[in-house]
Amino acid sequence: MKKKLLPALIVTGLIILVVIIMGITALINKYTPTKKTEDLKEYFNISSDDEAALIVDNELSDYKAKIIDKKIYVDYKFVHDSLNSRFYWDANENVLLYTTASDIISAAADSNSYSVTKQTNDFGYPIVKATSDSALIALDYVKQYSNITFKSYDDPARIVITSKWDEIDSATVNKSTQVRVKGGIKSPILKEVKKDDKITILDSGDKWDKVATEDGVIGYIKRKALSESKKTKLTNPDYEEETFTHIKKDKDICLAWNQVTSQSANSKVPQVISSTKGINVMSPTWFYLNDNNGNLADIASKDYVSYCHSQGIEVWGLFSNLENTDVDAAYVLTHTSTRTTLINQIMSAAFNYELDGVNIDFENITGAAYGDSYIEFIRELAIKCHNNGISLSVDVTVPASFNKFFNRSDMANFADYIVIMGYDEHYKGSDAGSVSSIPWVTEGVESTLKEVPADQIILGMPFYTRIWELTPKEDDDAVTDTEDQSKYTVASQVYSMDAAAAQLATNNATAALDEESGQNYAEWSVSNKLYKVWLEDNTSLEKRLKLVDDNKLAGAAFWKLGFENSSVWDTVIKYLN
């Protein structure tokens, strides 16, 4: 019996031993860090020997640098979006432009030289190379005009760029350890780090911190392997911030747009001014883009300017892109040669008519490419204006999702004044509503203040309103629920202040304050049609002028002379001195 039990006991013992060994092995495997390393070429997504990864402010970019003849080149779109939006690439004429506070700097594709206004400089190797859909710019050239630093590393090739000079959480490594792809000892190793290596902490976890090494590797490291983090302010001692100067007035701007449609209408300026109070800037609508070569048409008058000057009123001629609908303004602005012609024409007009200022009113600008070209136009024009003591103001819509490409901050660097067109909240073809409700204008001012200094903002205000006509789409239906405007044909017509008031009187309608819009509102019915109007009057005007006063804006502008009730000027001079 004992002889039979012995083999069974041995087998059982062996099984137990194997189980114990397996358990110990599993425990060892569980708590033993993997030595597997990550392929850094794959990690940085490098597919060819002439590529280099780009790590910008501790984030891996989707863009890649190109190594050409041992020089580092980066895509124009990357430069514009991530490093310095003031670089402007004209893909039509293959020229790279950069505008400083005082100079226009240009470099032609494949050229070693660049011009700073009239001086030519040698860069030593090609500055920019055109590609099928963009351009490649030498990173050293970008650095020359940008608040950035960069270092290059090998195995694999990568460029680590710093462009944001904020506080970071920094630490040093306490003992040799590894940076891993993810937090956990089983995650592959990205890089071995040594005692006293410097690390930037991007995010702190319970046991693992997300970090960036000085050579651009971003991964995870055990928290206990790091010293206590401390705040470190990044600085770039080699970069000197530009100083922008502006031609600004030491008084409130009270600007009135004077719509002039013929040469003969200029002779009426004495009567026009005599019906106002407090105006110190007149902006006549004299000039417009007239062809695709950048030439202007004008109906200006030296006598008009002389009369305004005799009354102590400056003249800021308005230049627009609206009158000649056959002209492709986008074409003019996206070609450097035609844009330059336009700027020269504007300056020639300013000299010829002795204008004190230039007011740019280019509208219907859509898309980033057109928007970038428009801002470049403002930069280049500003230099010419300032060199000749001429004030530059630019009319812009209120900030909205459809015009995010407008870099109002950079526009304000160059232009002296940014004029918010605080009207057309509702417009021909839209649903019925206020032309300029007080909450909408308030939001527009607040949004603009995030990008533009208060003393450079002029708030544009309407002297006009729209009367809306709502007709049921079924002829025999009466007007009932007008909240759902899809059931109605909506039309509108522009009215001056007095003409709108006359419509109320004719239709026995009474206006009352509408709390939502902050304006006086009236409605009436004729047959099966409903008419609505949000009035422009002293009530709405005073609320906007109070916005100017409360926010210490540079002043106000009014569209347009002749549409106002005469009483508004007493309200205006209460706020604009």
What do these predicted regions represent?
Residues 233-345:
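Glycan-recognition patch characteristic of GH18 chitinases/ENGases
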